[in-house]
Design a protein with these regions (language model features):
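Active-site recognition of the HExxH zinc-binding catalytic motif
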Residues: 153-166
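Short pre-active-site segment immediately N-terminal to the catalytic Zn-binding motif
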Residues: 133-154, 173
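Post-HEXXH active-site segment of zinc metalloproteases
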Residues: 165-187
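Acidic/histidine-rich, surface-exposed loop or edge segments in extracytoplasmic proteins
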Residues: 53-71, 133-136
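Auxiliary, metal-adjacent structural segments of Zn-dependent hydrolase domains
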Residues: 72-132, 145-148
């Protein structure tokens, strides 16, 4: 089991087929524990960074990027600020600085992944864009997306976990609620054309069903979970109100009838 100070995935984009590189093993692991955290990192060397990169502060000085390749710093800052802006619109907050590390490789006990959020150190780790395409599982829904869009989705997903965790003020939020918010933001923020491509790759019949927003469904069908989550968010009069309720501890999908 991972140390308590690491949040178990919801934040990890590895939990998505196509993001996660050994999905069968992941699925069994996922169903055998309750997620209390947002990312699991191996105790030894959680990431590989080349060539002594420098931490660059974004225009939003609460965000900074560490990258061995400077050309991706501006892109990472742009996507992080864009995601933060949307999350703030939904009532979340960022009281603490967040660092984003662009790395060649991220490892944990169940395999390699493309992105994680470490809530202890407030660090998001994302694979460098140039490494993403080769890391995707064959047939992944993400393989139809341009690399830049995948990178945007990864950054948005982890920013959602980070701001939800910071906004909860220590409230112990359920795994499924964390993953709901991250899935919603990942799909909500990318261009509608690419959002629809992901939805078409894992369609869920309308109307959206709150009973499908569960850790069990996420374990077996993460992309259908994400489709249903975004459709549920989009169908509500004020989808952001649900996110505010989750952050305040006033709502959980674990309490909804199945």
């Amino acid at each position: 089991m991972p140390p308590k100070n690491y949040f178990v995935d919801s934040a990890v984009a590895c939990d998505h087929p196509g993001f996660y590189l050994n999905y069968d093993r992941f699925r069994m692991w996922k169903l055998n524990r309750i997620c209390a955290a947002l990312a699991i990192l191996s105790a030894g060397s959680p990431c590989v960074v080349s060539a002594s990169p420098e931490l660059i502060i974004c225009q939003d000085d609460q965000l900074s990027v560490l990258s061995p390749t400077p050309e991706f710093v501006e892109l990472a800052c742009h996507f992080a600020i864009e995601a933060k802006t949307r999350l703030l619109e939904c009532g979340l907050h960022q009281p603490n600085p967040i660092e984003i590390f662009l790395v060649e490789r991220i490892e944990h006990d169940i395999g390699d992944c493309l992105a994680t959020y470490d809530c202890t150190d407030e660090i998001i780790r994302v694979k460098q864009p140039e490494s993403i395409a080769d890391a995707l599982v064959e047939g992944s829904p993400y393989s139809v997306l341009p690399t830049t869009v995948i990178f945007q989705a990864l950054v948005s997903h982890e920013m959602a976990h980070a701001l939800l965790e910071q906004s909860s003020r220590g409230t112990d939020l359920a795994f499924v609620d964390h993953e709901y918010v991250a899935a919603v933001m990942e799909l909500d923020i990318i261009d509608p054309e690419w959002r629809q491509a992901l939805i078409d790759a894992a369609p869920v019949r309308l109307p959206p069903k709150p009973g499908l927003i569960s850790a069990l469904i996420y374990g077996f069908e993460p992309r259908k979970f994400a489709t249903n989550a975004w459709q549920y968010f989009n169908a509500e009069v004020d989808g952001c109100e649900r996110i505010r309720q989750i952050a305040d501890g006033n709502f959980s999908f674990t309490d909804q009838p199945r």
